[in-house]
Structures are given as structure tokens and as C-alpha cells.
Amino acid sequence: MDDGRDEEIFTDLVASAVHDVKNSLALVLNSAEHITDMEAVPAAAHESLLLLQHEARRANADLMGLLGLFKIERGSSLVRPAVVECEDLIVELLAYNSGLLASRGITLEAGEIQAAEGYFDRGLVAGVLNAVINNTFRFARSRVTLSCHLEDGFTVFRVLDDGEGYGPKMLSNQPQEPGEHSHRSTGLGLFFARRVAELHQHRERIGRVVLTNRPGGCFELWLP
């Protein structure tokens, strides 16, 4: 028996199963979003649908991260960088997330956008930022601000909320392992975000994730 071949087959099966579940979850999410927009939905059901929408987005982000990590481990090229207009990406993030956050009385707004263009994988970066914004559904009090600026040769995307901030363990600069739970994360999302950042490299510069409290949670994605 070829243990290496068996492991490869098992990995392929798991990746395929995760992909199928992700597709099914996407259908559930689309249906929930469609029903939520219907005027005839009772208030009590509307609240449940919004929670379902939030949790489905969170699970979908985790599955996308898991698939991405599978591809990285298999040596697949995950990052396909291109020139991206930063303001367009911010507008896209606002459009996708504003309605859900507004249902909780949270205003999602654009802050200062100093970077006109960046060179990165738009899909991966949008996925990371959407997951971070969706997470503020539980932790922001009333406001979340998206901004983008240039610093030391990096394009920096920032998600700032007015909640209680990140816990000490998440601020310790020690990368969380997948499955390790903390105040605001299961670990997988942050682990994948760090890997996406690190896969963006230019000359001597390597992308990174920076977490701070200002005093609410401040997530920064630094892309060279």
C-alpha cells in the first residue's frame, strides 16, 4: 500500500467535500439574502434571517480559507496579483456589508482613501476584508470605518470598529494556529489572512497583518 498516494487521495476528497459544502452554503446565503429583502417578512423572522446571513457568511469565509490553505499546502499558485483601484474595492466592500451591519444599528463608512492603486490579488484581499467586516457584526457598537493609505511602500487597508477591541492573546503578535479560539476569532480566519498577506511579496517587502486597539479593534492588511 502506498501511504503517500492514499494521503493524496484523502486530501483530494476532503478538498472536494469542502468545495461542495461551500457551494451549498453559497446557495443558502443567496436565498437568505433574497428572503431578507422581501417586504412581507415578519420582524421576528427578519431578525433570524439576518443572524443566519451573518453566520453563513462567516462559515463561507472559513471554508474559503480552508480551501486556500489546502491549495497552499499542495504547492498551487494562490495569488494572482493585478493593478486594483483601491477606492473601487472600498465601494464594493461597503455595498456588500452595509445592509447587514445596518440591521444591527451599525454604520459602515469609508474613511480616508489615500492610495489610488495597489498591486495585489483582488479576490483574496476582498475575501479577507469581507470576513473581518462581517466579524464586526458581533463586536462593533455603532460604527465601522474602512480606509486605505500608503505607508513605507505598502498599501494598507484598515478596518476600525468602536467595540471593546481585541484580546491580549490576539495582540501578542504570535500567529494563531487554525482552530485556536480567542475573543474574536476561531483562529482559521486570522491564520488565513496572515498567509494571504505573506504571499504578497515585492522585492524585500512581505505583506503582513497588524492588530491594534484604537481603542476599538483595528485590523490592518499591509500589502507591498
Please provide the spans of the model-predicted regions.
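Residue-level recognition of the "H+4" position in the DHp/HisKA helix
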Residues: S16, N23-L27
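Conserved C-terminal segment of the DHp
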Residues: L27-P42
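Conserved micro-motifs of the catalytic ATP-binding
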Residues: R74-V79, E117-F120
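Conserved catalytic submotifs in the C-terminal HATPase_c
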Residues: A82, T107-A116
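Short beta-strand/loop element within the Bergerat-fold HATPase_c
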Residues: R143-G153
